[in-house]
């Protein structure tokens, strides 16, 4: 698609960008956060719920959909949009990260990767061409190349080999891609090495993809290293193409990513922590299970106008979580997605008015981030899913 991304404004004092991404299912205002619906559903929410909080772009995962219900079934149902009754924008991940998180359950060669299904133990083999074909059959608006994501403790030689294989697979994905109304994004790898990140970004930029993602980050490394790598890598990517930082979704990280020049984010964080009783607020995450909320008559977040905060007291939400009522997870998820949607709208407005830096400083002056040691510990647990299942 021609002119699929328009850059409207750049901050005068940072690299923050305001743009518009055009797809077959509509326009996306950037910077944007995408909720994750790995298995064709954002957990606990309906499409109407998402639209009610101004979400018009979500992510689904090809790995999970390939295994269950299967790409042919979704294609027979008219594609992923019709299958899940979502008429807005869908980005599909190739599933590379999920496959490589299987560790001892997978083997790879130059042709592709073989792995054992975490569902039934069957052996599967996927090539870069398969990954493209699957996503074309799904009919997503944005598809991702198959890449190799090296593990966080990989040696420099292993990171180099993964980067070079990612480059070769990217070329093959580009050659196999024929669905003109679908954008195919490349994925920059290179670990935490500034030199390898430069090489990867420059090589993939030379192939002229419609957009570029930064993979292999936010895998448990300190945040300052994450964003130092992001800032460095983006210097070597074209300014007229969208930049996508995979797996980042904490409010403070969205602000930092935007200041680096990132346009698109996705993460399971808001939905996952919601199901654990954590509500985003301007002051930081609030644990609804705390006894202090047992008698609070007002909403959990007085500054929020979402469905949950308009209709339910913190005391009621506390009760639902203590009783493990399913409604608790739904109401918490609505709130967290609404919070991030509103935050991104405020970020976009601040860039338009060229006051993003003031907005960021004001937000962070009140917001209390999660303890870094606890965050890294949680991240390491989440990276490998549960019961042998790869992460979402």
Curated annotation (Swiss-Prot):
Task performed by this protein: Catalyzes the base-exchange of a guanine (G) residue with the queuine precursor 7-aminomethyl-7-deazaguanine (PreQ1) at position 34 (anticodon wobble position) in tRNAs with GU(N) anticodons (tRNA-Asp, -Asn, -His and -Tyr). Catalysis occurs through a double-displacement mechanism. The nucleophile active site attacks the C1' of nucleotide 34 to detach the guanine base from the RNA, forming a covalent enzyme-RNA intermediate. The proton acceptor active site deprotonates the incoming PreQ1, allowing a nucleophilic attack on the C1' of the ribose to form the product.
Native species: Dehalococcoides mccartyi (strain CBDB1)
Lineage, uppermost ranks: Bacteria, Bacillati, Chloroflexota, Dehalococcoidia, Dehalococcoidales
Residues that hold Zn(2+) according to the record: 304, 306, 309, 335
Gene3D superfamilies, per the entry: Queuine tRNA-ribosyltransferase-like
Superkingdom of the organism of origin: Bacteria
Pathway: tRNA modification; tRNA-queuosine biosynthesis
Catalyzed reactions per annotation: 7-aminomethyl-7-carbaguanine + guanosine(34) in tRNA = 7-aminomethyl-7-carbaguanosine(34) in tRNA + guanine
Quaternary state and interactors: Homodimer. Within each dimer, one monomer is responsible for RNA recognition and catalysis, while the other monomer binds to the replacement base PreQ1.
GO biological process: queuosine biosynthetic process; tRNA wobble guanine modification; tRNA-guanine transglycosylation
The protein, known as: Queuine tRNA-ribosyltransferase
Entry cofactors: Zn(2+)
């Amino acid at each position: 698609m021609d002119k699929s991304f328009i850059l409207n404004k750049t901050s005068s004092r940072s690299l923050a960008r305001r743009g518009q991404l055009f797809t077959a299912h509509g326009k996306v205002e950037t910077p944007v956060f995408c909720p994750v619906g790995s298995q064709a559903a954002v957990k606990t929410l309906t499409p109407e719920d998402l639209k009610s909080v101004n979400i018009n772009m979500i992510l689904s995962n090809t790995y999970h959909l390939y295994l269950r219900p299967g790409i042919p079934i979704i294609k027979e149902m008219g594609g992923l949009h019709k299958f899940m009754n979502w008429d807005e924008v869908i980005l599909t991940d190739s599933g590379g990260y999920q496959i490589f998180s299987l560790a001892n359950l997978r083997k790879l060669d130059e042709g592709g990767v073989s792995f054992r299904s975490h569902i039934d133990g069957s052996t599967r083999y996927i090539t870069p061409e398969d990954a493209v074909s699957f996503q074309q059959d799904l009919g997503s608006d944005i598809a991702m190349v198959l890449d190799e994501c090296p593990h966080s403790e990989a040696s420099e030689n292993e990171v180099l080999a993964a980067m070079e294989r990612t480059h070769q697979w990217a070329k093959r994905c580009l050659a196999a891609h024929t669905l003109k109304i679908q954008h195919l994004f490349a994925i920059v790898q290179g670990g935490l090495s500034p030199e390898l990140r430069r090489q990867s970004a420059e090589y993939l930029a030379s192939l002229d993809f419609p957009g570029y993602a930064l993979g292999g980050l936010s895998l448990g490394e300190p945040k300052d290293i994450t964003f130092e790598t992001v800032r460095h890598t983006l210097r070597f990517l074209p300014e007229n193409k969208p930049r996508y930082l995979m797996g980042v979704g904490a409010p403070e990280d969205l602000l930092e990513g935007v200041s680096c020049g990132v346009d698109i984010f996705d993460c399971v964080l808001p939905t996952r922590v919601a199901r654990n009783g954590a509500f985003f607020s301007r002051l930081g995450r609030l644990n609804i299970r705390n006894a202090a909320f047992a008698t609070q008559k007002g909403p959990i977040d007085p500054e929020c106008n979402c469905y949950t905060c308009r209709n339910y007291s913190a005391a009621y939400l506390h009760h639902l979580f203590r009783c493990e009522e399913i409604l608790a997870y739904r109401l918490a998820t609505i709130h967290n997605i609404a919070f991030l949607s509103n935050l991104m709208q405020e970020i976009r407005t601040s860039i338009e008015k060229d006051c993003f830096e003031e907005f960021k400083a004001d937000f962070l002056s009140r917001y209390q981030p999660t303890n870094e040691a606890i965050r890294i510990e949680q991240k390491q647990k989440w990276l490998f899913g549960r019961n042998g299942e790869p992460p979402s």
